[in-house]
């Protein structure tokens, strides 16, 4: 009896990707986040699909259609809460996944890393346009402020902003096109995830030691399928606790007020997962400079493989670089906190110092520490 799993054209691909895939024998729970992100994406697409069945992308009815979903649709409140908090779980997993990649030197698989960074940007774009859809105060003003940043581009800025708006302000045309983008982007993300996996399976997974793992591989199933299910249980528990007990904890109270172009909220701020980048944007008093810093805060990930100066791949045996890595992590927490604070002292100066430290650590300090560690290990 020939095993259909190994012969059928479609099954064969799934088999080589998730069942008989040779995986390093020592990968830790930090390697769970890839599969968790896959689950997050699936949850978001499914809940989003059901929300889209009842949502109307019109400025007059968008806000009330979301209220209608929560009040009148069977389990609409649950679908909406899962979708809103699912986004938070998605970003938590994303940040941990990227952090794992930096810590263990996974960025040396350049193709996988680069498409991963593009994926991160695409997910951020999707979350941004999605946040506009409920048409609350923060939706409207967030859309106005962030799209307006493009007007900092010389010559074409203003024209570009009005082209994106579909008029002279954020209005019906903007909401309709943002809904269209929010619907299509997750499917584009899905295709990119497949490419991400394709590149990863060209090289095989990295492992905590950073040493070539080819001498000791085990099949993905049952070992890592079971291990991933454990991580999945933890994530689903967290998501359900959030969605069922405090669904609005991570949201903004201003978004429960329908959008009003005549009334600006006292503090315009994005969702928590954008606050670090928002803090970097606000820390520069010049509009164009702020926009460039905002872009650089994410795009700097693309040059990390070029900044790898160590003779070792992973940080596991490099205490100086480890300390700087955790400083970078703490710095991102500080930036996240600052992004949610009003623009006044001492928050302004803290934000500026944290922004400088962010780029300094990635571009100069960690590569310099790696060179020092090379010398300390081999002083010849």
UniProtKB/Swiss-Prot annotation:
Membrane topology: Multi-pass membrane protein
Binding residues annotated for heme b b562, in chain numbering: 83, 182
Cofactor comment: Binds 2 heme b groups non-covalently.
SUPFAM superfamilies: a domain/subunit of cytochrome bc1 complex (Ubiquinol-cytochrome c reductase) (SSF81648), Transmembrane di-heme cytochromes (SSF81342)
Necessary cofactors: heme b
Keywords: Electron transport, Heme, Iron, Membrane, Metal-binding, Mitochondrion, Mitochondrion inner membrane, Respiratory chain, Transmembrane, Transmembrane helix, Transport, Ubiquinone
Chief site of localization: mitochondrion
GO molecular function, one term: ubiquinol-cytochrome-c reductase activity
Stored InterPro entries: Cyt_b/b6_C, Cyt_b/b6_C_sf, Cyt_b/b6_N, Cytb/b6-like_sf, Cytochrome_b, Cytochrome_b_C_euk/bac, Cytochrome_b_N_euk/bac, Di-haem_cyt_TM
GO cellular component term of the entry, any: respiratory chain complex III
Compartment(s) where it occurs, according to its Swiss-Prot or TrEMBL record: Mitochondrion inner membrane
Binding site for a ubiquinone: 201
PANTHER family per the UniProt record, alphabetical: CYTOCHROME B (PTHR19271:SF16)
Subunit description: The cytochrome bc1 complex contains 11 subunits: 3 respiratory subunits (MT-CYB, CYC1 and UQCRFS1), 2 core proteins (UQCRC1 and UQCRC2) and 6 low-molecular weight proteins (UQCRH/QCR6, UQCRB/QCR7, UQCRQ/QCR8, UQCR10/QCR9, UQCR11/QCR10 and a cleavage product of UQCRFS1). This cytochrome bc1 complex then forms a dimer.
Family to which this protein belongs: Belongs to the cytochrome b family.
Function of the molecule: Component of the ubiquinol-cytochrome c reductase complex (complex III or cytochrome b-c1 complex) that is part of the mitochondrial respiratory chain. The b-c1 complex mediates electron transfer from ubiquinol to cytochrome c. Contributes to the generation of a proton gradient across the mitochondrial membrane that is then used for ATP synthesis.
Extra information: Heme 1 (or BL or b562) is low-potential and absorbs at about 562 nm, and heme 2 (or BH or b566) is high-potential and absorbs at about 566 nm.
Stated name of the protein: Cytochrome b
Upper lineage: Eukaryota, Metazoa, Chordata, Craniata, Vertebrata
């Amino acid at each position: 009896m020939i095993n259909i799993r190994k012969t059928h054209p479609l099954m064969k691909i799934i088999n080589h990707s998730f069942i008989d895939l040779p995986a390093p024998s020592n990968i830790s729970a930090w390697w769970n986040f890839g599969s968790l992100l896959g689950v997050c994406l699936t949850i978001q697409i499914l809940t989003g699909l059901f929300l889209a069945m009842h949502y109307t992308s019109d400025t007059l009815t968008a806000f009330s259609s979301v209220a209608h979903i929560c009040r009148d649709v069977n389990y609409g409140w649950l679908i909406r809460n899962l979708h809103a908090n699912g986004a938070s779980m998605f970003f938590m997993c994303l940040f941990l996944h990227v952090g794992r990649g930096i810590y263990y030197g996974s960025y040396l698989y350049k193709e996988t890393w680069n498409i991963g960074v593009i994926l991160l940007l695409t997910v951020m774009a999707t979350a941004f346009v999605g946040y506009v859809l409920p048409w609350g105060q923060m939706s409207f003003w967030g859309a106005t402020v962030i799209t307006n940043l493009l007007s900092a581009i010389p010559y074409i800025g203003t024209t570009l902003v009005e082209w994106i708006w579909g008029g002279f302000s954020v209005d019906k045309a903007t909401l309709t096109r943002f809904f269209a983008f929010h619907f299509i982007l997750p499917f584009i993300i899905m295709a990119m995830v497949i490419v991400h996996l394709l590149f990863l399976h060209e090289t095989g997974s990295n492992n905590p030691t950073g040493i070539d793992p080819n001498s000791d591989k085990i099949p993905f199933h049952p070992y890592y399928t079971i291990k991933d299910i454990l991580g999945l249980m933890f994530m689903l528990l967290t998501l359900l606790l959030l969605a069922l007990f405090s669904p609005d904890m991570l949201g903004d109270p201003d978004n429960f007020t329908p959008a009003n172009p005549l009334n600006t909220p006292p503090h315009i701020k994005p969702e928590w997962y954008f606050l670090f980048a928002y803090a970097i944007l606000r820390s520069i008093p010049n509009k164009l400079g702020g926009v460039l810093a905002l872009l650089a805060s994410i795009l700097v990930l693309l040059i990390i493989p070029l900044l790898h100066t160590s003779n070792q791949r992973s940080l596991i045996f490099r205490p100086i670089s480890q300390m700087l890595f955790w400083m970078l992590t703490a710095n991102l927490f500080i930036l996240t906190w600052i992004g949610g604070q009003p623009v006044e002292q001492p928050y302004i100066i803290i934000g500026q110092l944290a922004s400088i430290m962010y780029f300094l650590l990635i571009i100069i300090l960690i590569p310099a520490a790696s060179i020092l560690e090379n010398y300390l290990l081999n002083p010849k």
